[in-house]
Amino acid sequence: MQIKADQLAAHLAWGLRPLYTVYGDEPLLAQEASDAIRAAARAAGFSERKVFTVGNAAHFDWSALLGAAQALSLFAERQLIELRIPSGKPGKEGSDALQRYCEALGADDVLTLIQLPRLDFQQQKSGWFSALDAAGVILRVEPVERRELPAWIAKRLAAQGQRVADGGEALRPWPSLPTASKATSLPPTRSCKSLRCSIRRVA
């Protein structure tokens, strides 16, 4: 099951799936999506958290990941397992391990969050990624297009209790808006807090 970032909140409101995969090259959006999943997990009683980071796939202990879901502590009823693969390349052993991991999912006391960078077409068609897709929810974070930035920023300001004058038109001539594919989401997000001249508090 694949969803977009702006669909995540509504999805989480209906309940959690056992596996979430967040991937893409927009650091802020990926972080926010992961934070939203973590918050929903905490609210659902997933009180223990284990994090695995794959530095070198060839030297990573994949058996530790496979065993983690079966190693609940005496004091934690439910646990969140996070797997981070910065390279997006688990290797052959990792590919096999991820597919076995997905096959073993099903326990209500374990929720898994996998974080990946941007993946190319071949990676998205791989056996391990297909297994993640079949076992849970795939969330791809995409760059915000330049033409969409004014509305995107206005929406974020509204979430802070602020709004843009003239329905967002005040942002259109903003010279510091980055181009679509080259910039991350971080600069305009930080700038949201400095646009005091173009916004006003919602009464």
Task: Describe the function of each predicted region.
Residues 1-203:
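Conserved beta/loop motifs at nucleotide-recognition and modification sites
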